[in-house]
Amino acid sequence: TTILDAGPGLATAASGNRLALQTPRLTIDHNDASQLSASCLAYAAHCSDAAGATLADKVVSLDWPDREAARQDKFRSQFWPYDLLRPVDFDTATLEAGIALPVGGVVHDFGRVIEPARLCQHLAGPTPVITNADIVKITRQGRGLVLFAKNGRQFNYEQIVVATGAGLPESLSQL
């Protein structure tokens, strides 16, 4: 197992995001997908905390713009666990966030503000990482794959896991 990263270090090229939010992806109809999202959020929070990647241990989701306020109103009318989705007025939102906020919203106590690069480094553990491996072409060779980097290097693997973010459609079209 080896990780190839296009940037100069693990998780440094991923759209330049130095920070990320971990929040639940709930659906209005309170279905299995929402339940899975809630479970995944608890796991993600645990992983981020264990990695030392957590910068803030809750997320305040504001009732703004109006579309988001209407969506969150529907969530507030449902029966979600209090620590997953806690309604707050603007005074409480201000207190929770530590800065003046003009509107209320909901607090996700298991939400996190994280440092993605630190989380990726923790999850990778001792797995070898090859950096500056900006893959520009993938071809099949026998039962394996050959990956060609922009700088001329080639990598041969029997199996790959592709995690290229916005570049995924282009990467998959080469397979």
Give the ranges of each region predicted by the language model.
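Short beta-strand/turn micro-motifs composed of small residues
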Residues: 5, 63, 164
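Helical element adjacent to the flavin cofactor pocket in flavoenzyme catalytic cores
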Residues: 106-149, 155-159, 163-164
